Each structure stands twice: as structure tokens, then as C-alpha cells.
């Protein structure tokens, strides 16, 4: 298999779920071995670019934020990163004229649609993978996330909320190709009781039923259209996991199991993997 990029640039407009600011985002083709690079076009400086790397993750409160050494940041990258992973885009330049990726409808589906509209181009370089060689695990009280050696990607994820609207949900997923059909349109979610507090902290400024699932104090989903899936909540947590793991720079080949995961946990797992060179190796498709 070869690396891929877009055939042509594609753009969208939208508001940030936390900043409430309207931004334009453009995904552009990039050369082989570039990876995913974000550029803040509203900042006229040669230091306005940030590599979408786990090492550059600076905040994981409610979303994933990346920053560079010059304190320039871009937040809520995970849904776009998941779409790039799900569409097998290895190399892209993301230009954005603000501090946060547009939330769109709260899922990855709009970004998948953009990529499909732009088209995909195969490049003259082998696709690379991160193959896990031994178990790597992160645990915090009853939350855990670990990966073990496998010949292909396989994920088993469980969430457990006290809210009866969500409860305990489990999902197993194995084929990257089915991400766009079965996971990409699962939306982010939140509790109405938390909204005022979050807004007082400068968060959730752009949140609405147009871009998130809202749950009230009676454990009722308030969105007029309801849920897209009975287990949409765990599907979205899986989407977040894929987006966060793609900050490794390449697709991970491993059996992954998680319970009550978070953006912080996802990032911690990558740091732990890369801290031990005996736990992984980089391979091409011919070496899988």
C-alpha cells in the first residue's frame, strides 16, 4: 500500500464548540512523508504551524488541543483527525484562520464528506504503520486503556455512565474501511447541567443541539431528531480514540481495549508506547 493525500484543496466554515468563534478550514494536499500539519493563517508568523503529534498535545480537557513552542494552539482536532485516519489520508496541510477546528455537526462525517469531495491521490511512498510488539497499559482507578500485539487493528471499548440515557455501552470494531459508514457520524454529547459551568470557564460557547447530543437532568435526550444509533455514545468515544491515536503520525496496528477512556488517557497511552522502543516498530504493509 502507498501513502495518500488529497487530489485538491477543500474548505468549510463553521463555529468552534468551545470558543464559539467562526472559522474557515481548508484541507490541502501535501507531499509524501509530511504527515498532518496545521497552520494558523490568522497569525502572520513563520511560527504559525503545528504538527499533529501526540508530543504537541497541550490540553485534553473536553477535547484535544495541540500547541507549538511559540504558544500557538489549535483545539478540538480529534474529529478531523479521525476523519483523516478513517479515509486513509497520510499527508495533509490543514489551514485554519482561528484557534479551534469547526465542530460542524459534532461528528467526523462532514470532514469525511469533504475528503471524499476532494478525492484521494496515491503517492510514491510506502504507507507506514506502528506495530505494537508487547502489551502497553495505562490505568487510573477503574479507567484503563491498553494495547497488545495483533496482526490487524481491533478495538474493544466500553463506557459506563450513571445517566440512564447512556448507561454501560460496549462496541468492538475491526475494519478501518467501515469507519466512514459506522462510526464517523456519531456525535459528541454532554449534559445540560454542565453547560452554565462550562460557559463560565470559557468553554461550550458554541454548543447547541445542532452540534451535540444534549441530555437533561431527567436523563432524556433533548435533540428533536433523537439519536442516530442506540449506542451513539460509545461510537463517538471510539471516534475520539481513533482521532487521538492518529496523533501518533501513522495508523496503529494493535488489539486495543479500553474502559471509560478519555482524551487524556488516549494521549497518555501514546506517550507510554513511544517511551519504550521495545514496545513497537515501524513497518510497511509488506511487513505486517
Swiss-Prot record:
Task: Please state the Enzyme Commission number of this protein.
Answer: 3.5.1.108
The pathway where this protein functions is: Glycolipid biosynthesis; lipid IV(A) biosynthesis; lipid IV(A) from (3R)-3-hydroxytetradecanoyl-[acyl-carrier-protein] and UDP-N-acetyl-alpha-D-glucosamine: step 2/6
Under Pfam families, the record lists: LpxC
Is the keyword Amino-acid biosynthesis assigned to this protein? Answer: no
Residues annotated as binding Zn(2+) are 79, 236, 240
Q: Where is the active site?
A: 263 (proton donor)
Task: State the UniProt keywords alphabetically.
Answer: Hydrolase, Lipid A biosynthesis, Lipid biosynthesis, Lipid metabolism, Metal-binding, Zinc
Reply yes or no: does the keyword Aminoacyl-tRNA synthetase apply.
no
Please name the GO terms that the record assigns under molecular function: metal ion binding; UDP-3-O-acyl-N-acetylglucosamine deacetylase activity
- Protein's GO biological process: lipid A biosynthetic process
User: Which Gene3D superfamilies does the record cross-reference, listed alphabetically?
Assistant: lpxc deacetylase, domain 1 (3.30.230.20), lpxc deacetylase, domain 2 (3.30.1700.10)
Q: Which reaction does it catalyse?
A: a UDP-3-O-[(3R)-3-hydroxyacyl]-N-acetyl-alpha-D-glucosamine + H2O = a UDP-3-O-[(3R)-3-hydroxyacyl]-alpha-D-glucosamine + acetate
Q: What does it do?
A: Catalyzes the hydrolysis of UDP-3-O-myristoyl-N-acetylglucosamine to form UDP-3-O-myristoylglucosamine and acetate, the committed step in lipid A biosynthesis.
The UniProt entry's sequence similarity note says: Belongs to the LpxC family.
HAMAP family assigned to the protein according to its UniProt record, in alphabetical order: LpxC
Protein name listed in UniProt: UDP-3-O-acyl-N-acetylglucosamine deacetylase
Q: Which organism is it from?
A: Rickettsia prowazekii (strain Madrid E)
Amino acid at each position: 500500500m502507498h501513502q495518500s493525500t488529497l487530489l485538491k484543496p477543500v474548505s468549510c466554515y463553521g463555529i468552534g464548540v468551545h470558543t464559539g468563534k467562526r472559522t474557515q478550514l481548508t484541507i490541502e494536499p501535501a507531499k509524501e512523508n509530511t504527515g498532518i500539519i496545521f497552520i494558523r493563517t490568522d497569525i502572520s508568523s513563520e511560527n504559525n504551524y503545528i504538527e499533529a503529534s501526540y508530543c504537541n498535545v497541550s490540553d485534553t480537557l473536553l477535547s484535544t488541543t495541540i500547541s507549538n513552542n511559540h504558544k500557538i494552539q489549535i483545539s478540538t482536532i480529534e474529529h478531523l483527525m479521525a476523519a483523516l485516519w478513517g479515509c486513509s489520508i497520510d499527508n495533509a496541510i490543514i489551514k485554519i484562520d482561528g484557534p479551534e477546528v469547526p465542530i460542524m455537526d459534532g461528528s467526523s462525517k462532514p470532514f469525511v464528506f469533504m475528503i471524499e469531495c476532494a478525492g484521494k491521490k496515491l503517492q510514491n511512498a510506502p504507507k507506514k504503520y506502528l506495530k505494537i510488539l508487547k502489551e502497553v497499559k495505562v490505568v487510573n482507578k477503574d479507567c484503563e486503556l491498553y494495547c497488545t500485539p495483533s496482526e490487524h487493528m481491533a478495538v474493544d471499548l466500553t463506557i459506563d455512565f450513571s445517566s440512564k440515557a447512556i448507561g454501560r455501552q460496549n462496541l468492538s470494531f475491526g475494519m478501518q474501511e467501515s469507519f466512514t459508514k459506522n462510526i464517523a457520524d456519531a456525535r459528541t454529547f454532554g449534559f445540560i447541567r454542565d453547560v452554565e459551568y462550562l460557559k463560565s470557564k470559557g468553554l461550550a460557547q458554541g454548543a447547541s443541539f445542532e452540534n451535540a447530543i444534549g441530555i437533561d437532568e431527567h436523563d432524556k435526550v433533548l435533540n428533536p431528531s433523537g439519536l442516530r444509533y442506540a449506542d451513539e455514545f460509545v461510537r463517538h468515544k471510539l471516534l475520539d480514540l481513533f482521532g487521538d491515536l492518529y496523533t501518533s503520525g501513522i495508523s496503529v496496528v494493535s488489539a486495543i481495549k479500553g474502559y471509560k477512556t478519555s482524551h487524556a488517557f488516549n494521549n497518555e497511552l501514546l506517550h507510554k508506547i513511544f517511551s519504550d522502543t521495545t514496545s513497537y516498530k515501524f513497518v510497511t504493509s509488506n511487513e505486517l
